Amino acid sequence: MRERGLGEEEIFAELCEARSRDVPYGRVLSSMCTNPHPIAVKAHQEFVNTNLGDPKLFPGTADIEHRCIGLIGDLLHLPAATGYISTGGTESNIQALRTAIQMKHTDRRRANIVVPESAHYSFEKASQMLGIAIRRAPLDDLLRADPSEMAALIDKNTIALVAVAGTTEFGQIDPIEEIGRLAQEHDLYLHVDAAFGGFVIPFMDRPAKFDFEIPGVQSITIDPHKMGLSTIPSGGLLYRSESLMKVLEINAQYLTSMVQTSLAGTRSGASAASAYAVLQYLGRAGYREIVATCMENTRILREQLEDMGMEPIIEPVLNIVTARAKDPVGLRKKLAEKNWYVSTTVHPCALRMVVMPHVTADVIEAFTADLKKVI
């Protein structure tokens, strides 16, 4: 660290140079994040020095978080849901499994969770951090969780089931109603990871059931900083009842609130304010329009890829396209040389593209033109 500080102009010259080397979103088809809505940025800036970790000092900010959870809960068919704004899907998924452990009062050294093979890697982190085993159930032919395969992995030490609404690789939605019945039959905690799909599915023409409308669902991960167009980091963890969240309470006597339930201690209120602002600004109609545009662009991309002989692995369910290719990994590298960034799936291996709001029709036209040159 310097003895004497630099001037603002010199500092920002360095920062801007570094920022200029980042890939602009207009060249990115691999990410589930996008440019935040301008009102989200404005709200974030207004609350940048707030701390939800000490809500008695920031009661207004805490109220905004409470209202934000209410709006998201309403979207998920439970306006009375409780929860908090997290850093994102990973934290929310870890916390949900912490809740499941506390609810079961079991020996975590023997405990296990059953997840589909398509579950996010954050559950592997949770397994390591919490000291519980993770059992991965094979998928069906449409790359969804197979309830019968999940049932076969349940034993007396199983504490929770996980289902996904918008899988990271293929954008598939698990049969959550069936998994919900399975959870109830075995008296198990069911967590739904809707980090991506949570702000897509409710605004589709024929939305699949995935949320608190299903009796067995106890908690849901949903990320405003993905298709919710909030600033990063803005994740969400919602519970069916306050009693579920209360099992996470930790004494924090030196704070004005005395207890905490979140994983992070210090939490920026800017995340909650950003999410709340964009939810209020767009409303259901605004989100429906955004999702409709993304799905139309998904259709356009899927058709153009098929015209090049790249058939989809599955018909797109959400705004994610996966396409067969002779050498997906090699193709990804060739596209990166042209400053296009896509990803590849693992099982089966395919080219993967996420059609976020920044992936416009013009972006798709430019992308497919370059793809034709390297295919």
Curated annotation (Swiss-Prot):
Query: Which cofactors are required for activity?
Result: pyridoxal 5'-phosphate
Q: Identify the InterPro entries for this entry.
A: GrpII_AminoAcid_Decarb, MfnA, PyrdxlP-dep_de-COase, PyrdxlP-dep_Trfase, PyrdxlP-dep_Trfase_major, PyrdxlP-dep_Trfase_small
Q: What class of enzyme is it?
A: lyase
Q: Which Pfam families match?
A: Pyridoxal_deC (PF00282)
Reaction it catalyzes: L-tyrosine + H(+) = tyramine + CO2; L-aspartate + H(+) = beta-alanine + CO2
Q: Which GO annotations describe the biological process of this protein? A: carboxylic acid metabolic process; coenzyme A biosynthetic process; methanofuran biosynthetic process
Q: Which GO terms describe its molecular function?
A: aspartate 1-decarboxylase activity; pyridoxal phosphate binding; tyrosine decarboxylase activity
Q: Which gene encodes it?
A: mfnA
Q: Which UniProt keywords apply?
A: Decarboxylase, Lyase, Pyridoxal phosphate
Origin species, per record, is Methanocella arvoryzae (strain DSM 22066 / NBRC 105507 / MRE50)
Recorded E.C. number(s)? Answer: 4.1.1.11, 4.1.1.25
Q: Does the keyword Translocase apply?
A: no
Please name the pathway. Cofactor biosynthesis; methanofuran biosynthesis; Cofactor biosynthesis; coenzyme A biosynthesis
Q: Which top-level group of life is the source organism from?
A: Archaea
Chain positions found as N6-(pyridoxal phosphate)lysine:
K226
- The molecule here is called Probable L-tyrosine/L-aspartate decarboxylase
Q: Which family does it belong to?
A: Belongs to the group II decarboxylase family. MfnA subfamily.
Q: What does this protein do?
A: Catalyzes the decarboxylation of L-tyrosine to produce tyramine for methanofuran biosynthesis. Can also catalyze the decarboxylation of L-aspartate to produce beta-alanine for coenzyme A (CoA) biosynthesis.
